[in-house]
Structures are given as structure tokens and as C-alpha cells.
């Protein structure tokens, strides 16, 4: 979060040949160019969803205060990948469920140990921000049970709708970080601008406040 207020740099989609601004509006204000796909559920016998063993505490164990969104500082998390190779950089995205505030961390690779280490660094920097995080059940998050200072839960495998808030924000980020494009050249400043475009947007679901405005209210109270 930029304590100096909204970033004044102009934003362009990541598929442009340069990170430099060419338009007077941010890409987040344009209609989303996302392909909507139906949720694909994997079914076993009897039509029930087929689930692998969870990596740790299941989403089913989350307390009710997380489900109703009335209590802030509970998050959903995942990775946004450019090139799908573990030795390639990616983005770890964390979305606060009540305010929709987004934290984005560039990671040099998405090995489980790397994801755990950099998330722990973020929690250690902002210990008051994080009560819980719910991740998907991907192998990248296998070491998250080692996290200290924050409760970790795991959604069921093949169930992205269980982290719908984070999935929605990841869709917005995809306007700046398209699939198949390496993130090696994406600078910290560019990632911050893309994140600010989401956090500074007035949203109907937030009564036309911004995610950053609401998040600041909660952490300062």
C-alpha cells in the first residue's frame, strides 16, 4: 500500500510493448477482456466432488466470522503465473475478504519453500494485517503450514469458487500480466501501479468506496 496516496503514473495493459503510460485513463477503467468460464467440478462416484487430501486445515474448519465477512483481516490467496514453470517468477496475490484490498508480491519462482518464505516476510512486516489466509490446494502452498503469526486454511482441490474474491482480483490483474508472458521484466514499480489500479478503484460492492480507503479504516481503528 502506498502511504503517499494513489500512484499518479499512467497505466497500460501488460501486453503493450512497454510499461510506460500511453493513455490518459488506467486500464482498470476499461471493460474487462476476460474469458468467462464455467466452474469445472471434478466428480467422483455418486456425483460428489472429487477431492484430494488437503494440505492442512480445511476450509471447512474456518470459523463463522470468516464466512460472513463482518470481521476483517481474513484473506484469500493464490499465484498469478506468467510462464508455467516453477523456476519462473510469478505473483503471490492476497485479497482481504471484507474490503477487497489486494497485496501483490513478486516471487522469483513458485517452489513451495519460496512461497512460504516470502509470505512469512510479509506477515512479519505487517503482523496486525493478517488473521487468516485461505489458499488453494496446489503444491506451491505445501509449506504454508509452517507459517507463524497467521492461521492458514486450504480450499478443496478443483474448487476456485471457494476463493471467489481472490479469483476476481486475479482476473483484474490479468489485464496487466497476461498468461504466457514471462514476468522477469516486470518491475516493482509496475506491479505497484497495477495493484494500486485495483485498490484505488471506487467499487459498487464497497458502496463506492475504494478497497484502500476501507482497509485503512480497519487497520487504524
PLM feature segments, named:
Residues 6-67:
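Basic, flexible linker segments flanking DNA-binding modules
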Residues 81-83, 87, 104-128:
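Active-site beta-loop-alpha junctions of metal-dependent nucleic acid enzymes
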Residues 1, 14, 78, 100, ...:
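Mobile genetic element proteins and their domesticated derivatives, centered on retroelements
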Residues 67, 80, 87-103:
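Short conserved beta-strand segments at catalytic cores or DNA/RNA-binding microdomains
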Residues 100-105, 154, 179:
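Short small-residue beta-strand/loop micro-motif enriched in glycine and branched aliphatics
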Residues 128-143, 158:
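Acidic/histidine-rich, metal-coordinating catalytic segments
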Residues 124, 146-152, 158-221:
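Charged alpha-helix within mobile-element recombinases
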Residues 72-83:
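Two-metal-ion RNase H-like nuclease active-site motif
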